[in-house]
Amino acid sequence: MSITRTAVSYYNLGYVEHAEADFREMLDHGCTTVILAVTEFDFDFWRPNIPRIVEAAHRLGLQVLIDPWGIGKFFGGEQVSKFLQDNTGNRQVSALTGEALPYACFNTPSFRDYFARFCLTLAREAGADGFFWDEPHYAFPKSYASITGGAGEDWTCRCPVCMGKFREHYGYEMPKVMNDDVKRFRRREALFILEDTSRRIKELDPAQEITCCVHATLNSYYVTEHRGYDDWDEVAASPYFDVFSTTIVAWNLPRGFFEEITRRTVAAARKYGKQSERWLMGYYRQPEDFAEIDRTVELYESLGVDRLGTWTYRGGYGTVLAAPDALKLWDRIGENYKRVIGKGK
């Protein structure tokens, strides 16, 4: 099997002529897909431009996906959330302290309506080829487990809406200490918002492609993050998702970690007849030896990955999260993209 799609994320939605020049550079770097990181501010302020930018990408032959980047801080991303600015309620609440946190509770009707309106409006207006669900997650007041640390005790969300739904379903008050019922409840509610919006998008246009990208964590006996999308079988099995994707792994992590995450990603996707996607870290950090990029892409190829993604265009050049050698990093990723896409033709 060959890698058939190579994607890169893109922030700059202000001017079509600038975007078109950037799209040409993406093509020169072997990209087949651009993921437009559409912020809540972009939606409110630059929305008339988005269809024109999509059209420019299509004219050049790029597939276009829309990422509601950082929306409500429910998705990954550094952008500021207008929903949180305008809503002092509808926030995720710490189970142990009762503190309202700067993350929208995606189980509330208010945020679900906001998210659906955002996505469905763009589905009607923008003319893109699909949507990219970008690292959806519950908040972690104490930074739940990662590959380098143990699990924290606190979790979300224990807001009045979540507590009411839990009580209605299970017949008792949602506990402050996470149990199996809480884990199941959180996963079910987390999946609902994405499935419901994906279903409605596909009702508008059945050809719309939906990628769901979840955190690349081991979820083993020792390390389980409980982000809400940790059961990869549940996510990959959804009839509303076309591509099962797992997120970036930092370059300094062991190669065995890359391999295990990739094997599990491909296995979950194949089990449910979905395309698999793995990512390259193209910002902030870079490998000590750029040959590690080549080796990682070769690993992805050898394990049967269908698609590659890179965050972000030009290595984040000009941003606070730029890689030290951002343009060189971007060029090396481009060399690998051109190589694998050449094989896929």
Positions of PLM-derived features:
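Catalytic domains of carbohydrate-active enzymes, especially glycoside hydrolases
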Residues: V16-F43, E125-A128, A237-F244, L299-L308
